[in-house]
Amino acid sequence: MTDAQTAAERIARLRSEIDEHNYRYYVLDAPSVPDAEYDRLFNELKALEAEHPELVTPESPTQRVGGEALAAFGQVRHELPMLSLGNAFAEEDLLDFDRNVCKGLDRGIEVVEYSCEPKLDGLAVSLLYEDGQLVRGATRGDGSTGEDITANVRTVRNIPLRLHGQGWPAVLEVRGEIYMPRAGFEALNARAIENGGKTFANPRNAAAGSLRQLDPKITAGRPLEFCGYGIGRFEGAEVPQTHTSLLETLRRWGLPISRELQLARSVQDCLAYYRAIGERRQGLAYDIDGVVFKVNRLDWQRELGFRARTPHWAIAYKFPAQEELTELLGVEFQVGRTGAITPVARLKPVQVAGVTVSNASLHNMDEVARLGVMIGDTVIVRRAGDVIPQIMQVVGERRPADARPVEVPRQCPVCGSAVERTQLVKRGKGRASLSEGAIYRCVGRLACQAQLKQAIVHFVSRRAMDIDGLGERIVEQLVDTGLVKSPADLYILTFEQLVVLDGFAEVSSNNLLAAIAASRRPSLARFIYALGIPDVGEETAKRLARALGSLTRIEKALPEVLIWLPDVGLEVAHEIHSFFRDEHNLTVIGQLLARGVELQEEGELHAEFAACASLGELLDKLDIPGIAATGAKKLAEAAGSLEAVIGLSQDWLTLNTTKGLSEKARQALREFFAVPANVEHARAIEGQLREFGMHWESERRCAEGLPLAGQTWVLTGTLESMSREQGKARLESLGAKVAGSVSAKTACVVAGPGAGSKLAKAGELGVKVLDEEAFLALLRQLES
């Protein structure tokens, strides 16, 4: 045997031994050798690899020192979004969560088992293993897109570069938290002070800052640890049936999980766990800011599903935020994207939960009045959720004699325009009343540089038009120099205008122009979100685009039509309608389209939306006093058409014999339709329903005309030709409902590579199964 062969065998044995010792130390918390012996083995391996560099492999324990520095982090698209959790701040919140879980399962279930884990205060990450090898690490980012931090996560000592044991799937995505233990944090800050460097405010900031170092050698020198709490992709093996058994399986594969993991048999056990760990919180080796409870059965998790950004089956019960006393030195007013004038408290700096707090949100003037706060007061400040500083109350007995009231400026502090108090319109049962709102607003709109800057920052953000490289500093320059006076002006910027700006050169100017050009083809949903319509977030924009299908329909839609969308209430509907009635907004939209913005993914009205209108619902949405949903339905059945209802309202004899209506309702119906404006408005709504294809007379044709109408389909595994979302959208466009679990009512399951329990369930129930090739063939046939 040659020296190289002998060295290769010894290196392999050393790596195996060291990996086993790491597993016992970091995962089992049961080291089997003294530190000196571990160091001897590690140093022997380093020496052998130095002698035989051709035998060095990326998964070797010696390779955690970090490689070459990066110029920037790449982006990683999460195939399965990394969602955030809903929060509970009181026992009643947790009890409500438990009640909603039981109700959502809809089986008469009264007691649910939950997994319990401390909520670590670190940075959420995704670790991707292929064939047992760590191939990628990524931050959570916005939940859909994160940053590639593979080089940095490889330096974290307790993250296995290769999975332990056997039986792991071909593709395994582990999700968890990278954090810095308190002892390591204190040692890191002590070294920084010793070397005259900058210290970190708390372990969370230290962990986040360490992971975002472009030089992985710096990260390698930081005392970081990982704790797994769940999975994303899991392909090529059967997923365990419960969350706790899943975590134990991850532990067997060498991935650290919380040593505080427990199973609660009921919500009362959850409360007991929360109280117990809260009492031990300060004695833990790491910072936690609450407890995470998850429905333990994974099939129940799938059945309960998700909201837009949070699961129905998990919740984070936060610990009370830490509070301190300080002095209110003054109040400044900031101007937001919509012109809202927001009071911000300037405080005498104070340490709260390890962070120096000098500012706090006062939200609005109603909050100022509720607190009764005056400048000069001693106040209790806390970091709500351990993040956002808030003033909780005034210590009245410490109020100084020269305390001054907080007054709203009459002119905008930025542009000098008038400041007006918003008027709230309360609508209901055919009436509208005005009252003063809590918000004061600058009337300057885009003539106000503060509003313009914030509007453009929102317009170019990642979830909106996604113009890379156009940050707040550059937006400020563009606005301050007068180059940009509306979002549409971005699309007529020239190289000559950019290259003379501070911080710009030839390359950066060309890069920005290229990024602007690349944003010219946004999806309809992104464009709607980018416009910054008040109260229209990303999810509402997606619903508008998916349901109405075109900008023209969205612009024309009446509030009473918009409220047919799920989760769009009347107030939001009126905000949308008002936005598109505003001539200035229409001018900006027109300029954007004229300057080359081409909307993608526009199409027909979605079948699901087209099938939701009825005469009874229309009458109910008119808010006729005295006529609720049941009465509206009976009235619709009796009359049969809107014109018949209008006629009936004036036909006293026939109206008196109409069943299901009280005398009060009959009188209200007569009075409502006696007003010409009400008749005109009702006809306008019906006309728009006809125009959009939502009218009850066209409802049946819309539904029956779709080949998969009434069918429930399930997608499982990985589709190679499209994403799962694209597959879902194509099925829904054909009338199908796409569900997350298989039942006897499922019409068909589309199974790609890595399909697991859903495919097995389909086999048990005799549900039809299509592979991707057959699925594509069916789509081509039905879509042609």
Swiss-Prot record:
Its cofactor is Mg(2+); Mn(2+). Zn(2+) binds at residues 412, 415, 442, 448. The keyword Iron does not apply. Keywords: DNA damage, DNA repair, DNA replication, Ligase, Magnesium, Manganese, Metal-binding, NAD, Zinc. Pfam families: BRCT (PF00533), DNA_ligase_aden (PF01653), DNA_ligase_OB (PF03120), HHH_2 (PF12826), Nlig-Ia (PF22745). SMART domains: BRCT (SM00292), HhH1 (SM00278), LIGANc (SM00532). One of its GO terms (molecular function) is DNA binding. It catalyses: NAD(+) + (deoxyribonucleotide)n-3'-hydroxyl + 5'-phospho-(deoxyribonucleotide)m = (deoxyribonucleotide)n+m + AMP + beta-nicotinamide D-nucleotide. Its EC number is 6.5.1.2. Belongs to the NAD-dependent DNA ligase family. LigA subfamily. NCBIfam families: dnlj, PRK07956.1. This is DNA ligase. The gene is ligA.
